[in-house]
Structures are given as structure tokens and as C-alpha cells.
Amino acid sequence: MPPKGTPPSFESELPGRPGANWAALLLPPMAALSIGAAAIHFAVTAEHFTEFWLFGVFFAAIAWFQALWPLAYLRWPTRITAGIALAANLGTVLLWAWTRFVGIPLGPSVGDAEVVGVADLAASGFETLLCGILLLLVVPAVRSRLLATPVSRSAWIGSGFWVVVVVAITTWVLALHGNDIMVMGH
């Protein structure tokens, strides 16, 4: 256990759980969020290829990245691996926001703002939550502040459980109903 006041590291054992560390504990909710976003991106890749080939390439690439990233993190649970995922997912969320509020930056519909649909909102929500967890792993100051007490650590553990449950249910519903539940979709 690190000295008092030292932020828990990736390798820090969890109090009362010998052999368990923060990196391993946070993998299930991170994997659920990443795979949930990947499933949504896989589902819309073909549609985006018909709009513009580069859109399809982007959706295929981010879907594969999000599907495979948890395996890479399982093998290499480092700040670098977490940082790469943080950059990719944060970039995707920012691009999503840009295309909704400013307009599509390139392609045949350049300048047109996309409508917000339930599926893309869910994927962006998953990515945003994933970025929050990744921030814990990448930035020690965030980790030390948010995991400073046993109560806050327990809250994060409980939140992680509910993230997995909500992502699983949302992904399942979207897989079953897809475009039928679009709020404002195309």
C-alpha cells in the first residue's frame, strides 16, 4: 500500500483485496463501455460507407479499435495503453459533437449538421464515461483526489458495476431495435 497522501498507482493493491489492483478492477466497466460503443459503430459502418467512403473507413477503424482495445489493455495495463484509448475516444466524442453542432468537416455533406440519434448518443455517452475512467488511470492527480478515501473507492467500485449493467442493457436494446428508437435520426 502506498504511503498516506500518495495517489494509488496502477499496481497499487486494493485495501483488503490482495493481488487485486486498480487497473484490473476498472477493466470490466472499461471493456463494457468500449465494446458497447464498438457494437454501435459496427452496426452503422455499412450505412456510413454509402454516404462517403471515408466515413465508412473511420467507423470501421474506430469500431475495431474499441472492440480490440480491452484485449490490448488486458495484456498491457499501462498508462500508455490507457492514454491511447483516452485520445481515441475523446477524439471521437469531440468529432461527434462537432458534426452535430458545427457541421460535417468534409465529404459530400460538408457543413451540414448531423441530427442526434439515440444510437449515436449512446455511443458517445459510452465513450465519455470511458474517458472519465481512463482519466483516473492516466492522470495521477485525478486518481488521488477521487480515490482518496475508502468511501470514494467503494463508490467507484459500485459505479463500475452499474456501468457494466447499463451498457449491457442499452447495447442489447439498440441491437434489437436499432433505428426504430431514433429520437431524431436518419
List each model region and its residues:
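Membrane-interface extramembranous regions
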Residues: P2-H186
